[in-house]
Design a protein with these regions (language model features):
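Bacterial N-terminal signal peptides
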Residues: 49-62
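Short loop/turn motifs that connect adjacent beta-strands in outer-membrane beta-barrel proteins
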Residues: 168-196, 207-211, 246-259, 304-314, ...
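N-terminal periplasmic/intermembrane-space "pro-region" immediately following the signal or transit peptide
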Residues: 65-255, 488, 492, 504, ...
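Signature for the C-terminal beta-barrel architecture of outer-membrane proteins
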Residues: 310-312, 321-510, 572-576, 582-584, ...
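C-terminal structural cap/anchor segments
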Residues: 503-607, 615
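N-terminal secretory signal peptides that target proteins for export/translocation
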Residues: 1-46
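Outer-membrane beta-barrel channel domains
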Residues: 142-149, 178-187, 212-214, 218-364, ...
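Extracellular/periplasm-exposed beta-strand and loop segments of Gram-negative cell-envelope proteins
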Residues: 211-213, 225-232, 272-276, 284-290, ...
Length: 631
């Protein structure tokens, strides 16, 4: 027998105290015996209930007269059933399933209450029947599962491109600053886009360039000087158009297909003060007008696959395509014909390029691709790897390996009639060479310090060097660095560049560094006189010390047609500069560079002149850029 003590609240609001004894007979029936306690006993039982952790029993007693010595107590089973149901519904096992509980129906023993001889201390005995009552499993939701017929027909909503049509935006094909289908703002059909871009570039250039007096004739008879009139001026008008037809979402993943065509139209006019400066024919005199249509891009790009849920990918591009081997265009930046496999890994942190290219012949006077000529007999195989946030956050690192194989042994004249291959210097003989370029490039910042760095080594072999008929080993190197720091609207930078030169043009080593097709964005770029203008090597052959848009002293006829020359004097450049954003629309750039030869031996041999100073001079430049629509 288990004695359970509890304090109960009577239906009339009075407090009474009792003890409940529970017994079970042999038939399994349970009987309950309730004994009324005296006030003192009730107080004791009340305190014991705090420490004994009782099991709650929901039993309500009805008391007719609290002060009477005898009371009729009735167990109200109906009222207590509600309380039992509440307690039962909240009991749960550890796994969340309901457990079965005992549902008790109480039957009053009227005979016990009807006996007037019984006192308050006598017991009142009631017999209750206990039976197991299963509890239904709870459903997950009281809401019934919808049936197929409960669904309405779907409402079609325009995609994120065409939904603007319902908002009243008009498509203006002539307005590039508003919604425009031919600008790629929304699909042309399905998920195919069409994008048209046009860029107009107008150049008026007044310059002074060292110009030799004509060999056969001159514009001013009677001159005996080597150098003629330096004054020149040129006007160039270029219109570049680009047509892109592509399929894809264009925002979070690369297009599935891309077809790109970039024709460029050029008209140029040049006037000089010396004969034979523009054309090998003296009858052409001192002016030249030329036009050309070049194809700078014509390729198809196929998205092969996605390799991660972040849309890292592999793509294949075939055709005439722009390519740059590094961040600043030191080694190879051109639009050759080729096949390129490229893609990304690790959420775009790693990028790679694998490619094979053949350069196109260039138009001599515009520098654009000439698709009417055969491809050059020069194979370029490229493999490079870009790694973001390496070695630190905010800095890009790149490793490059390029193999160059040149087999151009035929004589080639440019459109103005001057010989371009082989170069008119030294023995003027056909050459072949195989060179491997290995390099590291970095671009980014370390804290507030911005940094661009590039380093290359060129290793290989050339058959018949420029000044010697013997084969020669190519061993040359290159290094450039440009740190800068920002002070609000002002950026201050320093530049240093070194390209190795050849110490002895007649030994079996070619140590002058030369690029494949350079276009350096460095030390002022095309705002620098030395980089922008082609400086001729007067009296040393029909070559230039450095080509237009080039910084290396390669001693080629020009970089568009000429072969690489690894027997050159090299270059040393040290400079400082500043870029000032005076207004959002107005930028002022200042540059001051010092230039020198790394070695003077190749220049001395070419000119048959000794004791040539290694200092080239100072290059001072300023550029004012106004962008009226920049905000």
């Amino acid at each position: 027998m288990v004695n359970k003590l509890a304090e109960m609240q009577c239906k009339l609001g009075h407090r009474c105290h009792f003890s409940v004894d529970t017994q079970q007979d042999l038939d399994g029936n349970t009987s309950r015996r309730c004994s009324k306690l005296s006030p003192v006993e009730g107080q004791i039982s009340r305190w014991l209930a705090v420490f004994v952790a009782p099991l709650s029993v929901a039993v309500c007693l009805s008391v007719a007269e609290p002060a009477a010595a005898q009371s009729d107590l009735t167990i109200d089973g109906a009222d207590c059933q509600y309380d039992r149901d509440r307690s039962r519904s909240s009991r749960r096992r550890a796994g969340g399933a309901n457990r079965e509980c005992l549902f008790v129906d109480a039957a009053d023993e009227a005979e016990a209450n009807a006996d007037p001889n019984k006192t308050g201390s006598d017991s009142i005995e009631s017999r209750v029947v206990v039976r197991n009552r299963p509890v239904a499993a709870r459903s997950i939701s009281p809401v019934p599962k919808p049936r197929p017929q409960d669904y309405d027909d779907p409402i079609l909503v325009p995609d994120r491109w065409r939904i603007v049509d319902t908002l009243g935006y008009e498509d203006r094909w002539w307005d590039p600053y508003n919604q425009n289908t031919i600008k790629g703002d929304k699909p042309l059909h399905d998920d195919w886009f069409f994008n048209v871009t046009a860029i107009s570039d107008s150049v008026a250039e007044v310059r002074q360039v060292p110009t030799p007096v004509g060999g056969q004739t001159t514009i001013a008879p009677g001159r005996i000087d080597v150098l003629g009139n330096y004054d020149q001026w040129a006007v160039l008008q270029t219109v570049a158009t680009e047509f892109v037809y592509y399929q894809g979402d264009t925002v979070f993943r690369p297009p599935d297909w891309e077809f790109r065509f970039t024709p460029v139209f050029n008209v140029n006019y040049t006037e000089v003060q010396e004969t034979l400066a523009l054309n090998v024919n003296p009858d052409e005199r001192d002016t030249r007008t030329d036009t050309h249509i070049g194809v700078q891009a014509l390729f198809v790009d196929k998205h092969l696959r996605n390799v991660s849920d972040r849309y890292d990918f592999d793509s294949l591009r075939i055709g005439i395509q722009p390519f740059s081997s590094d961040f600043r265009g030191f080694l190879f930046q051109d639009s050759p014909m080729g096949v390129r496999l490229f893609g990304t890994r690790d959420n775009n942190r790693i990028q790679y390029n694998l490619g094979w290219f053949r350069r196109l012949e260039k138009d001599t006077n515009s520098g654009l691709n000439s698709v009417s000529e055969d491809l050059r007999d020069e194979d370029i195989v490229v493999a490079n790897l870009y790694w973001q946030d390496q070695p630190t956050l905010g800095f890009f690192s790149q490793l490059t390996a390029i193999y160059l194989e040149n087999r151009e042994t035929d004589v080639f004249y440019d459109q103005n009639g001057f010989i371009a291959r082989p170069a008119s210097i030294g023995l003027e003989q056909p050459r072949e060479y195989d060179v491997a370029y290995l390099g590291y490039n970095g671009d980014g910042h370390f804290g507030r310090l911005n940094l661009t760095a590039s380093a290359y080594v060129a290793l290989g072999e050339e058959r018949s060097s420029v000044f010697d008929q013997r084969d020669s080993d190519v061993e040359a190197y290159f290094f450039a660095i440009e740190p800068s720091i920002d002070f609000d609207w002002l950026r201050v930078r320093a530049s240093f560049l070194y390209g190795s030169g050849d110490k002895d043009p007649f030994d079996d080593k070619s140590e002058g560094f030369d690029a494949i097709f350079e276009n350096p964005q460095f030390a002022g770029a095309d705002t620098s006189y030395w980089i922008r203008q082609s400086t001729p090597l007067i009296g040393g052959g029909r070559v230039a010390l450095s080509s237009r848009n080039g910084v290396l002293n390669s001693m080629r006829p020009n970089k568009e047609h000429g072969q690489a020359n690894f027997t050159n004097p090299g270059i040393v450049l040290a400079g400082i500069g500043a870029d000032m954003d005076l207004l959002p629309e107005l930028r002022l750039s200042l540059n001051a560079n010092y230039l020198a030869f790394a070695e003077t031996a190749p220049v001395e041999v070419a000119r048959a002149q000794g004791a040539i100073d290694d200092s080239i001079g100072y290059d001072l430049s300023a550029a004012l850029i106004w962008r009226p629509f920049m905000t």
